[in-house]
């Protein structure tokens, strides 16, 4: 895979520049498609289907309603394009895989930050942090349908495998 598409809205446009840099470091070209309204979705999916080998999704509530998510998943499956979801639920519905947060661990991290503030630290002195724990969710049925093989070492560490 060399070209990875991503659908986004104005709500998540700030994520795209850093995602492009990260993708480039991995030898990938990120192909971002701005979706201004759900009416633009069919054209955006068709555009990506002809130019990328996979679609990555950002958790964007303006883009991913239950109806639009179904549409994207159905078209990705029909076109045999791997769709990388943003949650366990999207993988259960047909995305190839997702990295999802362990929300209990995120809550613990938030508590640690709150304790620092309560102990007198200025909020602007606390660095932004990423989640310490991520879960890998994988849909084996989707992998078979689109003829993609996920390395066994990844499958072995999956929190959930949907068969």
Which residues does each PLM region occupy?
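Short hydrophobic alpha-helices and adjacent helix-cap/hinge residues
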Residues: 1-163
